């Protein structure tokens, strides 16, 4: 893919003029030729950069995976956290990368319409024959901070979401998040584990959500991903099937509409949990424990009831709090 640089710059500057106009700061001659000044190296990056994947957390924070000439990059937009990983190195000059990101992603200016107006309206090719483009630093100052990190190794679809989760988990420590340090540590450890089948994309999105229920449901989906393990593994052994258990479960669901029972499967999975963790779950969810209480069953019932209260609304599930 070769990106049209004229079209990319037109998109970026057009977004800025629209932003100002919608807030009663119309830029004179909004269709005039304007672009971001760049050097030949930046032009080459803008032409060939490919946005492989991205995630947006509102209008001001975004994560992106870029590929440029078979080299892989991770970009953060609007993040306070600076990636601290030996596998990634911060690029000092991100010209070309920045225009690509601002063209491809729905990033909103982080300054006032008046500031956008003052920068964009200052010049154009139509008003000044000596115009050579807007200064890159001036245009970038209108948006949240962009950082680009080059990866020491190629990135794949399987790797990018754990990478994004690691970054978003660390970002949650910087302030304004309800996530405490211990939970952030657990999320970072989960990212490093890079477990097949876990919904890392959903986990990543929920880490910066202001509602804790979002993260609970994402973690619940992680547990759901293992529900078929017990039955599918038994079938694999009994029939001497060579395929992985999750492939067997997929075939069973597609061909026979079979899926594991949710509540009982949750208890089976929780049987592998540490006793201290199960006791902590019960304590958090106000479960009264007796000496003979089956911990996995008690924790499973409480988790499932909480899940139902979040997902459904029924009088029997409603609470006064």
Language model features by range: what are they?
Residues 2-211, 225:
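Charged, non-catalytic interaction/linker regions at domain boundaries
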Residues 178-321:
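Amphipathic, oligomerization/interface secondary-structure segments
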């Amino acid at each position: 893919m070769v990106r049209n640089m004229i079209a990319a710059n037109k998109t970026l500057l057009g977004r800025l003029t629209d932003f100002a106009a919608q807030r009663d700061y119309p830029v004179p001659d909004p269709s005039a030729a304007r672009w971001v000044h760049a050097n030949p190296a930046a032009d080459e990056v803008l032409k060939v950069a490919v946005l492989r994947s991205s995630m947006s957390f509102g209008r001001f924070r975004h994560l992106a995976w870029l590929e440029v000439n078979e080299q892989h990059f991770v970009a953060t937009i609007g993040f306070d956290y600076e990636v601290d990983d030996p596998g990634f190195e911060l690029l000092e000059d991100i010209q070309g990368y920045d225009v690509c990101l601002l063209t491809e992603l729905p990033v909103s200016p982080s300054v006032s319409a008046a500031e956008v107006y003052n920068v964009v309206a200052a010049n154009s090719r139509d008003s000044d024959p000596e115009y050579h483009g807007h200064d890159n630093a001036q245009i970038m100052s209108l948006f949240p901070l962009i950082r680009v990190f080059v990866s020491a190794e190629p990135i794949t679809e399987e790797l990018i979401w754990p990478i994004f989760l690691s970054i978003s988990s660390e970002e949650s420590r910087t302030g304004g998040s309800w996530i405490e340090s211990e939970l952030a540590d657990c999320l970072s450890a989960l990212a490093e584990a890079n477990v097949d089948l876990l919904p890392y994309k959903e986990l990543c999105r929920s880490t910066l959500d202001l509602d804790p229920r979002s993260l609970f449901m994402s973690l619940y989906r992680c547990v759901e991903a293992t529900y078929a393990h017990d039955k599918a593994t038994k079938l694999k052994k009994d029939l001497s099937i060579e395929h992985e258990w999750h492939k067997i479960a997929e075939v069973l669901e597609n061909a026979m509409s079979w899926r594991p029972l949710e509540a009982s499967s949750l208890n089976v999975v929780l049987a592998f949990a540490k006793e201290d963790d199960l006791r902590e779950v019960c304590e958090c969810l106000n479960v009264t424990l007796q000496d003979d209480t089956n911990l996995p069953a008690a924790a499973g019932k409480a988790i499932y009831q909480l899940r139902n209260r979040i997902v459904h609304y029924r009088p029997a599930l409603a609470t006064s709090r």
